[in-house]
Amino acid sequence: MAHFAQLDENNVVTQVIVVGNSDTADVNGVESESIGVAFCQSLLGAETNWKQTSYNANMRGNYAGIGMTFMTGVATLGVGSTDVFVPQQPYASWTISTTQARWEAPLTEPTLTDEQQAAGSYYTWDESAYQADNTTGWTLTTPE
């Protein structure tokens, strides 16, 4: 089975459908994304925009999900393509990782101490704090 993501005019994933392998293959049985795209367009309209995604292969960084963005020309190592699916950017200061298809904070998340871990503490990103002072951003939260 093959999976294809439909993109809107902003390259945001609106749905993902499953397509039979035979609907992505030529007469010789060779699978091709373009054949799968044509099949999807025959089902849901010639003007629709489709990109193949995969659970099993690292072909585009992440398996596409509704709301994710398809980005082209992203220089990420360890990803089989420079065209990747990424979640929505969580904060304005975060950038795409150069090693994986995911967003990274501009500051490394601090490591929790053993005591903090035992207390169930965790760090959250505070964009306002970072914008006010770009040497801060991670806030330690401890449940009561």
Segments the model singles out, each with a brief description of its role:
Residues 1-144:
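Interaction-interface detector
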